[in-house]
From Swiss-Prot:
SMART domains: KAZAL
Domain Kazal-like positions: 2-62, 63-111
Species the sequence originates in: Felis catus
Protein name (Swiss-Prot/TrEMBL): Double-headed protease inhibitor, submandibular gland
Annotated site (Reactive bond 2 for elastase): 73-74
Molecular function terms, GO-annotated: serine-type endopeptidase inhibitor activity
Domain of life: Eukaryota
Signal peptide feature range: none
UniProt keyword annotations, A-Z: Disulfide bond, Protease inhibitor, Repeat, Secreted, Serine protease inhibitor
Main location: secreted
PROSITE patterns: KAZAL_1, KAZAL_2
Length: 111
């Protein structure tokens, strides 16, 4: 079952764009970024060329915002939802971005 879509039209105010509260009700986007609430999700993504979707409610398990395309050999295994083991967060995040959010963390450690 996929998560319900975020209805951003409810946050649009004519002529003034989107104004959000500071309520902490985090959601995780398919970009694996944690947004403080649905309104902030809509505000920060209104100018993106592709529609961003909600992955799930609550914080993302692993933040992939500052990943590098070039990874170290550090060994801190992560098990992905695909059953694959990734040697470290960098390698995991590269795969998350490549798959556009269809991969998520199953557990820390080996699969």
């Amino acid at each position: 079952a996929s998560p319900p879509e975020v209805n951003c039209s409810q946050y649009n105010r004519k002529g003034s764009g989107i104004t959000c509260s500071k309520e902490w009700k985090p959601i995780c986007g398919i970009d694996h970024k944690t947004y403080s609430n649905e309104c902030m999700f809509c505000q920060l993504n209104q100018n993106k060329r592709f529609q961003l979707r909600k992955l799930h409610d609550n914080k993302c398990q692993i933040e992939c915002t500052n990943y590098s395309a070039i990874c170290t050999m550090e060994y801190f295994p992560l098990c992905g939802s695909d059953g694959q083991e990734y040697s470290n967060k960098c390698l995991f995040c590269n795969e998350v971005v490549k798959r556009r959010g269809t991969l998520f963390l199953a557990k820390y450690g080996q699969c």
